[in-house]
Amino acid sequence: MGVRGLQGFVGSTCPHICTIVNIHELAERHRNKYPGCTPTIVVDAMCCLRYWYTAESWVCGGQWREYYCALRNFVAAFTSAGIKLIFFFDGMVEPGKRDEWVKRRLKNNREISKIFHYIKSKRDQPGRNMFFIPSGLAIFTRFALKTLGQETFCSLQEADYEVASYGLQHNCLGILGEDTDYLIYDTCPYFSIGDLCLESLQTIMLCREKLCESLGLRVADLPLLACLLGNDITPESMFESFRYKCLSSYASVKENAGKKGNIILAVSDYISKVLHLYQGEKKIEEMLPLGPNKALFYKGVTSYLLPGQKSPWLVQKPKGMITDKQQMVSLNPESKQEVPMCIDPEFKQEVPVCTNPESMQEVPMCMDPEPNQEASMCTDPESKQEVPMCTDSESKPEVSQYTNPESKQKLPSGIDTEFNLEALMCTHPEFKQEDVMDMEPEIKQVTMVSESEILKVARMHHVHSESYLVYNILSSGEIECSNTLEDELDQALPSQAFIYRPVRQRVYALLLGDWKDGASTGPVVKEWFVYPGNSLKHPDLVRPLQMTVQGGTPSLEVLWLSQEPAVQAQRLDTLLACFNLSSSREELQAVESPLRALCCLLIYLFVQVDTLSLEDLHAFIAQALCLQGKSTSQLMHLQLDYINSRAVQLGSLLVRGLTTLVLVNSACGFPWTTSEFMPWNVFDGKLFHQKYLQSEKGYAVEVLLEQNRSWLTKFHNLKAVVCKACSKENRRIVGRTHWDSPYTGRQGRQGYSSYRTDSTHGHSGQSWRNQGSGGRQHERNHWRRY
């Protein structure tokens, strides 16, 4: 994440870049300077997850009540100081960064293997030095923050770009995160989440102007430096030989800087003393050894340019560029936002550098009447760049649609929704269209559906952090799921990627239209799901799976746009059909909230996975019931005798099921409120682990329920619903002591490790190992198809 080696360099060689600041005091200055405007901090939420998750237990599936309280305290600290928070989450992985994403996932796999080795050898949780965030943490953090009344957005491209863009365009007090890319973007000040003291609101501010002063560079040079050092777009190996040439000729080597630090100093020295001499006179490829990586390099530099910005390293003065006075024209005659334009010398067309064609939010802007901000805010005193504003009150198109009733927020303005090819060709006119397409063949996106209204609704829910994966499926047909705490050596439990795949396949059928199972043509979704044995060299190519909905599968227009009360029943029918549980509708309707969604999930799990036992079911139900009577403090102080590796995997498996419910619920038009399947309402990892250990030892149900008679009736009712639904699928749930009996489980089962891809299309009892893990016989194929 960020620029290679820059974090260590700042800490060891240039500590003066880091200034201790009090955010409360900065907010007071901001209020005095901009009367009537609320000081706002834009938060890179993905950088903050580790900071927010302070619970001692992390391997058991997550301490969700404790985590929710931590988020509430975090928000309250800023609210009491009169500071508004805007949260951004990663919404998708950009094609150009897939390799980096894969590299991190494979590294995480190795870390998870060490975690399970430790658990099985020590029967304890590893120390914080091996900490791995619980599955689903990012997804459920979005919903937690929305529940706490916070504005929460999910990105349509790389989140750090949208964070930096929002911070610049809305004159934010600063950015809160932990990513050196925020030192590179020319945006508002950057605060460290890792150094934040919540009680005093004191933290470290990293000043890009002081960084430039130390390196002898200008702020506009930082994107060039970042690409030469290596980042998520330009691999570190791309300019390795160039960096060492710079180092070999660098005369001011510092002993305390270390090798990486001196490389940064040497490259900066080369930029300031050599490249600056020919800037604007020579093309950048004439000054740097770009070779076949020219397109990737340009993409890397351009990725740091926020709306309205341009790089002097991508501008060629002699050719076709219009003057500064000619650059500022209006994109929309009704809009007051000015957008930089340039003339393409080949096509004689005006092309916008960076625009946001679908801005839907009107945000009060606080503009400094003076060109410079306060010195303490660490902004470039030489910068006279105006912050683009969008003040058109009529630029928000109204869309009549079914929306999540829990949502009240609008789209953020000033965000580029796609990588802007025109911007690259505009800022570098001799850079041809063919070069752009060579840069990344998947940039030119073809959506999976053509209905613009449906895509608008999906996009809105995506940006508002109300849905999960739906827009990705509709827009690009490509989704991903990060690592889960799964034991690659445990052959008795299938990976969550396979267990929930049939549900996802039915969602694909719902979202991508009608087609028949087994057809050679039709939509295919690329799944980048991490599971044991998956090298992630290519995505799994997964086809939709037909489902049966009573009365026929309703269209997305009906599910998402209809206001008719009767449609709510159709939404629920469709949700149950995605889990193949239509026959259990009546029983599930009788289950009270918030246990209904959990009950649905348990039925699906026990039908799918033969190796789940009666003891497992007792533990799942008992923890859900006992959770209703526990305070956060009681859950925090719960002590476990030891840690069981199988229980660790079961906890993660259930939480991944809850994230699958988020996907299905949003795809079906929100038949259930999100509170039905938020983990802090239905699951606690440590409590489940306790019940699992007790159930494994053969404790009576009364003991599992802590002698609470009122819970006993609910327990037996929930158990009856699950067992009855499973029996309809010929799945008999028995205790582990009966596993050797020839009459256990489902007829025709293939023994341990058996799970079903679907119960109605001839896949019953298919071994999960054949679906892609273990030996991976299909690896000889370029992409795997399902």
Curated annotation (Swiss-Prot):
Tissues of expression: Ubiquitously expressed (at protein level).
Main location class: nucleus
Keywords of the record: Activator, Differentiation, Nucleus, Transcription, Transcription regulation
Entry annotated with the keyword Transcription regulation: yes
Cleavable signal peptide: none
Protein family (similarity comment): Belongs to the constitutive coactivator of PPAR-gamma family.
Name this protein carries in UniProt: Constitutive coactivator of peroxisome proliferator-activated receptor gamma
Organism: Mus musculus (Mouse)
Gene: Fam120b
